[in-house]
């Protein structure tokens, strides 16, 4: 009888464990300021091997083991949120004009271009399609999309993806509360702060009072004041997010230094030493490989 009971307990343990999704694990890491695991964010998806902000770019990231994708939003003439970085579709599709010039049906007749500018068979995805694709598989960061905060919130509720999506902006806490105070505590919100700008310290102070999961720190020069503010953020219990995309965001500790100059310790290593545990990159596979050598994956 005792053995039978133990088998039953073991069975239910396996069932509960299998119910845990990859996203559950990532969400736990996101909310744990003491986790050693560094979250890798892929800028506009895997845009080197698929069109930026495309479903294929996100599928590639999932297969690669990326932790979070970053995307951008625009709205169509008929009020549908779609993925698009620029104000127009000219650079990234074979069409012309603003997304708001077209209905969704009209917009999806166009084809996305890849990173080399060649037209592909991929179409502009909606935010809802993307949420459903990524559900339980990967975290999502909405970069350009603050103006659609309320619409995004409704879609997150509809698709059951509230726990895995990070919404961000560079606005003050007072403005964000004024704009979206009714749902602010129901979403994962992250402030973006340029630590070189006047008023950065006050922004940090204000946001530490609500202890967001992370603060995105941008800086063109790593002054003692900048390093002090990052320490303050980390000590408050929020994670530090640093972009390694290009030099002006990280005082020269960028992806190209890591990959093209073969100096990852001068780039990603410096970022880790600065206390960051979330890194947004254009070189996700290389960064993942590097982090494994540092036992941070």
How would you describe each model-predicted region?
Residues 1-23:
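Bacterial Sec-dependent N-terminal signal peptides
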């Amino acid at each position: 009888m005792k053995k039978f009971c133990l088998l039953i307990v073991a069975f239910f343990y396996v069932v509960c464990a299998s119910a845990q999704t990859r996203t559950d694990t990532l969400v736990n890491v996101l909310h744990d300021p003491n986790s050693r695991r560094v979250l890798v964010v892929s800028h506009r998806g895997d845009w080197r091997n698929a069109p930026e902000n495309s479903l294929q770019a996100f599928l590639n990231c999932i297969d690669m083991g990326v932790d979070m994708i970053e995307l951008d939003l625009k709205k169509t003439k008929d009020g549908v949120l779609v993925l698009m970085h620029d104000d127009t579709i000219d650079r990234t599709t074979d069409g012309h004009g603003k997304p708001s010039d077209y209905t969704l049906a009209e917009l999806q007749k166009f084809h996305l271009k890849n990173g080399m500018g060649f037209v592909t068979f991929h179409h502009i995805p909606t935010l809802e399609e993307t949420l459903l694709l990524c559900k339980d598989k990967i975290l999502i960061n909405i970069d350009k999309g603050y103006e659609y905060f309320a619409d995004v919130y409704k879609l997150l509720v509809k698709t059951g993806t509230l726990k895995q999506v990070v919404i961000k902006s560079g606005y003050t806490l007072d403005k964000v509360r004024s704009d979206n105070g009714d749902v602010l505590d129901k979403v994962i919100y992250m402030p973006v702060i340029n630590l070189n700008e006047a008023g950065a310290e006050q922004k940090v102070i204000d946001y530490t009072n609500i202890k967001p999961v992370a603060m995105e720190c941008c800086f063109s020069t790593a002054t003692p004041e900048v390093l002090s503010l990052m320490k303050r953020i980390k000590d408050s219990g929020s994670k530090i997010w640093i972009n390694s995309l290009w030099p002006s965001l990280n005082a020269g500790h960028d992806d190209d230094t890591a990959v093209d100059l073969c100096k990852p310790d001068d780039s990603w290593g410096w970022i880790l030493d600065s206390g960051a545990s979330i890194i947004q990159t254009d070189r996700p596979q290389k960064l993942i490989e590097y982090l494994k050598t540092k036992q941070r994956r």
